[in-house]
């Protein structure tokens, strides 16, 4: 299974992604985790990333792409993977397709979109901000994050939809109900 996990901030994709890891026994790969692992392992790309981060700069896209490709090429990802947080836009999806082709994979198997209404996301994130004492997560900031996500992700949903790879799951309900919906559509 080669799965791209899509969902707005607060949609529950992180939680459901962990449940999928346990259920299917394949790794969940996030760009942040892959970046930290490459830096820790002191790979050539990891050293480039570390230099940028130490200077307070953004890590160049090409370095991020290389690190993701390195991670996808590791033995534990050969039988499948769950990508969380990548791709974020159409250009990254096209880069991902090239990576998978170079690695001998047949591309993304499914793109799972965990759909939650904007109002529910606002409610969840405000609740989380209050519980975690995150004063910077105000409603206007949250709505802006949702708008940015929607603008970036809409073409991505179309891209995977046209390929017949997009599956949408309603992300409201108990954790177990949502997970069962996900497992059902991935069968």
Predicted regions and their residues:
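Glycine-rich phosphate-binding loop of ATP-dependent small-molecule kinases
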Residues: 1-187
